[in-house]
Structures are given as C-alpha cells and as structure tokens.
Amino acid sequence: MSPPPTPPRRTPHFGDLTVMSLLISSLVLLVAYIAIRPRFSHGRLLVDQLHDLTAEEVSLLPEGTIPVVLGRGLGENNRGFKIQLLRLVMQRSGAPHAIGLTASALSQDAAVDALATGVVGGTDNPQAITVGAYGAGPELNRRLRAIPIPITGGMLGLRVGWTHHNRLAGLEGVHDREDLSRLTLLQGQGWSELEMFDQAGLRTFATPSQNLFRLVSEQRVDLFPQGVADVQAQEAIAQKWSKSIVMDPHLLIAYPFAGFFYVNHRNEALAAAIERGFRRAIEDGSYQELLERVVMTPWLKEQLNLSQRRLIVLPNPEGAKALEQVQSNHWIVPWETLSDGQINRGEQLCALPRFQALCP
C-alpha cells in the first residue's frame, strides 16, 4: 500500500505576513516601552521632547535631576515664550534637568499657594509645579523667591487691551489717566497689577482667569489690558469666545513692571540654575534672538501698530520696590525716560533700537 500523498506546502500570502509583522512589531514596542518607562524622564531630557511634566513623571526622575515644572497660564502651550525661555535658560545653566508645563492651567493664586508649600506632588501641590512666571510685586517677593531678571525685559509693563468692538468708539477718546479712570478695566484674581491700578485711581474688576474673555464678550468691562508679549498667544482664546473681541488700536498703557521666574525659597538648586543660565543667555545674545523670534513677531508688529498708539504712563511706586534688584542692562524698556514724561507716543519708542522689530 503506497503512503498517502504529501499535502502541498501552503505558500504564505501577503495578508498573512502583514498581520504577523504587525503582531511582532506590536510585541516589540510593548516590551521596549516597559523597559524604558522607568527612564522616561531621562530619555525626555536627552531627546528634548519637552511637553507636560506630570507629578508621576517627576517622582520617577533620576536622583540629581532638577524638576522644572512651569505653571501653565492662560492660553499657554509649549510654543509660548515663557516655556521656551525657560528651556533656553536651563540649557545654558548646564544643570541636569527635566522640564515641562503643568498638565493643566493653574490660576496664579493656586500656583503660588502650591509653590509656597515647598512640596513637589501630593495633595498640597498635585501638579508638582516648581517654578512660576508672574508679575513682580512686594507680596509675591515675600512668599516666593524671585530670580530678578525681567522675563521680557520689562515689556510686561507695556499693555494693550482686549475689548468688544462696540467699545472702540469710546476708547478712541481716551488720552490721559483721567480719561482712563472713567473706564472699567479687567484683571485676573491675584494678579500683582490690581493694587497698582487701585493706587492709580483706576476702576478695576477682578475675576478668575477662566472668566476673563467671557466678561469682555458680554461687554461687562471696557478694557482687558495685557502685556504686549502675551497677546498673540491669547488671540485664539479670544476668538473662541467671540469674534467681536478685538485688540484696541489706540492705547498703550505703561508702568514700571516686570515678570520674574519664581521658585520656593528653599529651592536653591533651581534658583541658582535659572539665574546662571539667564545671565549666560543674555551675554551670548540667544535671549534677544529668542525674544525677537517668538515675541516680536510679524503678527504682533501688524496688530500692535506701535507707532500710532497714545502712551499713558502710570506710577507704580510699590512695584518699583520689587524691581530694585534688576540690573540696568537687563531692561529693554527705558523706564526712567518713560516715567519722567520724555516719551508719550508710540512712535518715540519706535526710535529705540530694541523696539525696531515692532515698528514699520
């Protein structure tokens, strides 16, 4: 009896190979992920994939790596100037670090409270924030440790305003502080500007950050002044609320003011790294290059129309005390000249070399 015939060998089809390849690839990726997950933050540092940095990731950082978790503010993302500057500063510092934004936005009050605890993670600081970028003020300087180098060279004290287009006609007639005092201005709760506006005799309404553009869209305020370095990042948020929210083209409100990086008083390593790296970035020109590329953009130049604005300078005696440690060569805005009344029009600012990127 002859043996049974051997069945023909089945030739694998393309679809079989594809499915098998996908299964093998998926298995390899899974094994690789499990293997590298404990070193995720270290790998993040090496490949410069700097996005959000969560409390869990901070807890997994190698010993000796400084966690640099910047509090996310209104409209901020990983393309914003503050986080890009902080990346540059930390790179220049030479300190081992991992950096990112908090996973979600924090009000300034909540962020300052968390930073002041000195705890990274846990119920008192669930987003593990280690550094904030805020307008300088005596109370803030008491609660936290300031790195006294202006984040935008003092441009935070140059304010343009978001408004409803129905309010533009009224703003056109504003020429001085007395005119400005007849308006209702808007600011966020806990912001350092509130006390200064009160002392200047201005009428100001404060609200949590999530309500700011809603109040503008509902025409419950006349003007929401913001630093010229911040408005481009905020435009998308403004437009989501209402197409009727526009930038006022008439006024530039100025007062001696600056934003600093702030850390907990006991965070010596991070404070020293930020100050060292910031000074190096100023000295080698990379800070000015970043400022012109990210802040002084063609969009801002067009929307700001600086040469056509009327300048209203406000006193800020309390704020000036918080700025006493700033070295003169770290300022971009000439506050002494502005404060004594020598400059009262935007076109005069355009004559200064450091402002020419914002002017025709």
Map each language-model feature to its residues.
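Ligand-binding cleft/hinge of the Venus flytrap
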Residues: L85-I99, G173-D179, G188-Q210, E235-W241
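An extracytoplasmic/periplasmic, membrane-proximal ligand-sensing/linker region
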Residues: E283-P360
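Short loop->beta-strand "edge-of-pocket" segments that line small-molecule binding or catalytic clefts
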Residues: L60-N77, E172-G190, L223
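Periplasmic-binding protein-like
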Residues: G154-V160, Q239-E275, T297-K321, Q327
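Extracytoplasmic small-molecule ligand-binding "clamshell" domains
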Residues: D52-R142, I274, R354
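A ligand-binding cleft/hinge motif common to bilobed small-molecule-binding domains
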Residues: A116, T130-R143, F224-S244
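A conserved helix-loop-strand patch within extracytoplasmic ligand-binding domains
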Residues: R145-E195
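Extended ligand-binding regions for polar small-molecule ligands
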Residues: I83-S93, H165-L168, S181, P256-L300, ...
